[in-house]
Amino acid sequence: MKVFVAGPRAVSVLNKQVKGRLSNIINNNFTVLVGDANGVDKQVQKFLHSLNYRNVKVYATNGRARNNIGQWEVEKVEVEPSKKGFDYYAAKDIEMAKNADYGFMIWNGQSRGTLNNIINLAKLNKKVLVYFIPDKQFYTIKDVNNIKMMINTDNTPVSAKFHEFMHNSEQLKLF
């Protein structure tokens, strides 16, 4: 089983609950697909490396990994030179979503990239375990309706971001 693990660059600490779920992945010897960004990607890499876990693939745009703490295999994701910014780095997320069997996302309710990963995995009919930082809860996402339930209409800023994103996402149009 291959698990795509990701989250925002703004999150620089993994709590006990998240580390516990990562430990479950390790105990099952699942392959971890992780990006090379700072934030959650880097913290996940540090945690996996601290446990000498080797069943990891780091996805990097054009093969240039910004972070590869465990010197794991790098999956090179070719990106057209015309792509810039969000779209440039998001290309590797799309590949991880396609290649994964399951997703594990740590989301702060603000990261556009993490929300996009959750949506893309759901649209690919892949389950996603989301640790939703605002609620300090785990949610299992099977489809877009589950995302709506997770963000709850009471959380107006998060809900507004979700609805805006669903209507304006360039990355979603790549499928």
What are these regions (language model features)?
Residues 1-9, 34-35:
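Short, hydrophobic/glycine-enriched beta-strand segments
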Residues 11-155, 166:
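Acidic/glycine-enriched connector segments
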Residues 154-175:
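A charged, well-structured terminal subsegment
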